UniProtKB/Swiss-Prot annotation:
Protein name: Peptidyl-glycine alpha-amidating monooxygenase A
Any one Gene Ontology molecular-function term assigned to this protein's record: peptidylamidoglycolate lyase activity
UniProt topology in membrane: Single-pass membrane protein
EC numbers: 1.14.17.3, 4.3.2.5
A Pfam family annotated for this UniProt entry: NHL
Biological role stated in the UniProt entry: Bifunctional enzyme that catalyzes amidation of the C-terminus of proteins. Alpha-amidation is present at the C-terminus of many endocrine hormones and neuropeptides and is required for their activity. C-terminal amidation also takes place in response to protein fragmentation triggered by oxidative stress, promoting degradation of amidated protein fragments by the proteasome. Alpha-amidation involves two sequential reactions, both of which are catalyzed by separate catalytic domains of the enzyme.
The organism's place on the tree of life at top rank: Eukaryota
BP GO annotations: peptide metabolic process
Organism in which the protein naturally occurs: Xenopus laevis (African clawed frog)
Length: 935
């Protein structure tokens, strides 16, 4: 027995060693083998902040940590955390770059870098959250200088906590000597508050299509500006190969003033604005990108690869610190009528000499002498530039304690100018079937108004209540809106009134409607639901409401201007008809007002000034109801629907929508609790979304993150991100039962090899999720490009369940690239044979010893001579080796595992636990009661 134990110990060590020698195929996907590095000795500088003598300012060296790119057109990223958490300001940039090695570099600000590695391939992204460019350097381009008293805000509650440096290495020949590169930038940071805050205004196209062969194609973007005045002082343009010139203008009273104009084929750094121009509320920021389709044989779309195109204009500005915004976007296609008057200079390409193109060596530009190679086989590289991110997914912030706030029915949400969250709730009052009579008159006046504060302003991070108001004012609160001055606009469906409350004031500044008196004239409302305020004109709009089905517009002091809308008269509602206009949101850069037409299950948008219908957004996923809608800068609408009626299967969830075309970009649900009646939604500029529920009495916070199966761009191939550990499962229950099944599988494999026409390919079979974002999509896959027989081949396949001739088979496989680093098939077979050989040798030895000691009579004591050694191994002899008995003598051993594997029908068997939820999943839902049009 001691000898047997020693043998098993040796086998264990052999298998353990073989496991250590096995190189996981997942290592192919790791960005870099070295997770941490320090600055190379060849690099000058320090990773620590350097204090300025006699000043509280300090400098940070943000550099590559001694890298040696091995491929041309490599993009590498490096993150640096701000050394302090308090608010600070970046006031100067000093580049450290050699034009012979680095093509260009960009410095981003964000809060969540895409990687925690010391540096990484930027094709995996720069940041997980929203990022903005602070600085850009390109060879032969002038440096960016911030004006005196201007700084980028970092740290604190609203600023970026991380810097992410991106360096594009153009020609790898510069690294033939294997030197280490430390390209980067030194930033000077001060804790002193700056009177002017710098920011970036991004104007970009999301839907341009460039037909093949067209000589000139225009991409026009224009947005109405409605924020406080900004002062542009630098600009940067960006397109890919087809861009000829990008021009940006301010349009004021029909007059076009140039902000900046440049060829995107020249170094793409920030260039100074030549003629100072300010942009004020009411101005239009207009951008035109001039493209050519010459040389293309198919249409070109907006996208992130070099074979796609982009139309981006970055305007670096400064504005007064009191109401500064560090990042703004415009993605709206310009009206053709507006661009009829664009200056002709926007249609004239800026010539770029061939010498300049050669000198730039940009990976996206190809001259006639150097055409694109292998375009049919190679995936296009991606570049880190701003494009409408349609891979972002909203997930509940499960660490946010606000979901546990003790509130009543949550009817309204809004964000104040400081991005604090305001919650409008009903305290101990409840809207039910006894609240109103058939004439919409409130029946519970006797209980008095809500005695607690109905408006709570909470910190968006900690959910700490910062202030509260609204005691003894309201009976059944409904909608809440906060204007740019911090005033609260609320509605009360019991009072049939609209209120304007000043920040910090208990007495209303303005009251419209007659208390407890429903009506349909200009001085009455009937259960008004929501208010929206135009940030430019100050005019406000009232959704009225549950019983009037109209939108009313008033001047800032409450004078009636106009109204539109009528009750839906058929099963197919026409534009401008409503069945409970329940929620309003302004789209200020388009001058539009969007309405959640609740019981018609759609969103309608109108020109705010005229009330003319523009468009509707309606999807089957909405179901029968859309409760609330909210617009966020950047062209995104957020909405929530209601519980499905009987016969409808649409789940209760939130939606992220592309405002331009109405497409659904994402859906989201809570991780804690469940949506019951999500009643209102509020979206912040950074993509954070809050949802309030009138039945669950809760508020959820959702934060943007990459989708669970997010696309990770690696080495020119888009793959699904894989976790470090993957379980390789062997389904013994699914194995073929007969030799006939094995023969069928062998024939199928041989047939596949014949079809491959000499190209050896491994099937990649991890689940693939294809994302269609309105631009040419690339299949996201857990596939690594293989080269076999000299021909690179990719197979993009989803996992399928193979069934053949009565055999149920499910193969769950992870691709292992066959290489010298892996374990060969021969070695595996050898390791499997060794223990069998050892056991046979042990049995022979035991047999030999017994024969020597007791003689040949032992063969007849317990078995026939025909059984032989195999009989001993099966445990038929008292002196033989019984494997079951041997293992069963060990502590903790159970035979259940062996018994289960030996069951013939195991692939049809099912544990009791496996089906515990089956009845609940597949049973028909009960018929719900008729919905009550309340809340």
């Amino acid at each position: 027995m001691a000898s047997l134990s020693s043998s098993f110990l040796v086998l264990f060590l052999l298998f353990q060693n073989s496991c250590y020698c096995f190189r996981s195929p997942l290592s192919v996907f790791k960005r870099y083998e070295e997770s941490t590095r320090s600055l190379s000795n060849d690099c000058l500088g320090t990773t620590r902040p350097v204090m300025s003598p006699g000043s509280s300012d300090y400098t940070l060296d943000i550099r590559m940590p001694g890298v040696t790119p091995t491929e041309s057109d490599t993009y590498l990223c490096k993150s640096y955390r701000l050394p302090v958490d308090d608010e600070a300001y970046v006031v100067d940039f000093r580049p450290h770059a050699n034009m012979d090695t680095a093509h260009h570099m960009l410095l981003f600000g964000c809060n969540i870098p895409s990687s925690t590695d010391d540096y990484w391939d930027c094709s995996a992204g720069t940041c997980m959250d929203k990022s903005s460019i602070m600085y850009a350097w390109a060879k032969n381009a002038p440096p960016t200088k911030l004006p005196e008293g201007v700084g980028f805000r970092v740290g604190g509650k609203s600023g970026s906590r991380y810097f992410v440096l991106q360096v594009h290495y153009g020609n790898v020949k510069a690294f033939q000597d294997k030197h280490k590169d430390c390209t980067g930038v030194t930033v000077r940071v001060t804790p002193e508050k700056q009177p002017q805050i710098a920011g970036i205004y991004l104007s970009m196209s999301v839907d341009t299509v460039i037909p093949p062969g067209e000589e000139a194609v225009n991409s026009d973007i224009a947005c109405l500006y409605n924020r406080p005045t900004i002062h542009p002082f630098a600009y940067r343009v960006h397109t890919h190969q087809l861009g000829q010139v990008v021009s940006g203008f301010r349009v004021r009273h029909g007059k076009w003033s140039l902000i900046g104009r440049q060829s995107p084929q020249l170094p793409q750094a920030f260039y100074p604005v030549e003629h100072p121009v300010e942009i004020s509320p009411g101005d239009i920021i207009a951008t035109r990108c001039l493209f050519t389709g010459k040389g293309r044989t198919s249409a070109t779309y907006i996208g992130g690869t070099s074979n796609d195109e982009m139309c981006n204009l970055y305007i670096m500005y400064y504005m007064d610190a009191a109401h500064a915004t560090s990042y703004m976007t415009c993605v709206q296609t310009g009206e053709p009528k507006l661009f009829q008057n664009i200056p002709e200079i926007a249609n004239v390409p800026i010539p770029v000499s061939p010498d300049m193109m050669m000198m730039m060596g940009h990976g996206h530009h190809h001259t006639e002498a150097e055409p694109e190679k292998n375009t049919g086989l190679q995936q296009p590289k991606r570049e880190e530039e701003e494009v409408l991110d349609q891979d972002v997914h909203l997930e509940e912030d499960t660490d946010w304690p606000g979901v546990n706030l003790k509130v009543g029915q949550v009817s309204g949400l809004a964000l104040d100018p400081k991005n604090n969250l305001a919650i409008f709730h009903r305290g101990d009052h409840v809207w039910d079937e006894n609240s109103f009579d058939r004439n919409f008159v409130y029946q519970q006046r006797g209980i008095g108004p809500i005695q607690e504060s109905t408006i709570l302003v909470v910190d968006p991070s900690s959910s700490k209540v910062l202030k509260s108001t609204g005691k003894n004012l309201f009976f059944l609160p409904h909608g809440l809106t906060i204007d740019r001055d911090g005033n609260y606009w609320v509605t009360d469906v019991a009072l049939h009134q609209v209120f304007k409350l000043g920040a910090g004031k208990e007495t209303p500044l303005l009251v419209l409607g007659r208390a407890f008196q429903p009506g349909s004239d200009r001085k009455h409302f009937c259960q008004p639901t929501d208010v929206a305020v135009d940030p430019i004109t100050g005019n406000f709009f009232v959704a009225d409401g549950y019983c009037n089905s109209r939108i009313m517009q008033f001047s800032p002091n409450g004078m009636f201007i106009m109204q539109w809308g009528e009750e839906t008269s058929s099963n197919v509602p026409r534009p401008g008809q409503f069945r409970i206009p329940h929620s309003l949101t302004m789209v200020p850069d388009q001058g539009q007002l969007c309405v959640a037409d609740r019981e018609n299950g759609r969103i309608q948008c109108f020109h705010a000034e005229t009330g003319n219908f523009v468009k509707q957004i309606k999807h089957q996923e909405f179901g029968r109801e859309v409760f609330a809608v909210s617009y966020a800068p950047g062209g995104v609408l957020y909405a929530v629907n209601g519980k499905p009626y009987y016969g409808y299967s649409a789940p209760v969830q939130g939606f992220m929508l592309n405002f331009s075309n109405g497409d659904i970009l994402d859906t989201f649900i809570p991780a804690r609790k469940n949506f019951d009646m999500p009643h209102d939604i509020a979206a912040a500029d950074d993509g954070t979304v809050y949802v309030g529920d009138a039945h669950a009495n809760a508020v959820w916070k959702f934060s943007p993150s990459k989708a669970e199966h997010r696309s990770v761009k690696k080495a020119g191939i888009e793959v699904e991100e894989i976790t470090e550990t993957e379980i390789f499962e062997t389904h013994i229950r699914s194995r073929p039962k007969t030799n006939e099944s094995v023969e069928k599988q062998t024939q199928e494999k041989q047939q596949k090899q014949k079809n491959s026409a000499g190209v050896s390919t491994q099937e990649k079979q991890n689940v693939v999720q294809e994302i269609n974002a309105g631009v040419p999509t690339q299949e996201k896959q857990n596939v690594v490009q293989e080269s076999s027989a000299g021909v690179p081949t990719q197979e993009k396949q989803s996992v399928v369940q193979e069934s053949s001739a009565g055999v149920s088979t499910q193969e769950k496989q992870s691709v292992v690239q066959e290489s010298s680093a892996g374990v060969s098939f021969v070695l595996i077979i050898t390791l499997l044979i060794i223990p069998i050989a050892v056991l046979i040798a042990i049995a022979i030895f035991i047999r030999w010893r017994k024969v020597r000691m007791y003689g040949g009579d032992i063969d007849h004591k317990s078995e026939s001579s025909s059984v032989g050694i195999l009989g001993k191994l099966r445990g038929k002899g008292s002196g033989g080796l019984n494997l079951g008995t041997f293992f069963a003598t060990h502590k903790g051993y159970s035979r259940k595992g062996f018994d289960r594997l030996s069951t013939e029908g195991s692939d049809q068997e099912k544990d009791d636990d496996d089906g515990s939820d089956s009845e609940e999943e597949y049973s028909a839902p009960p018929i719900p009661p008729a919905p009550v049009s309340s809340s």
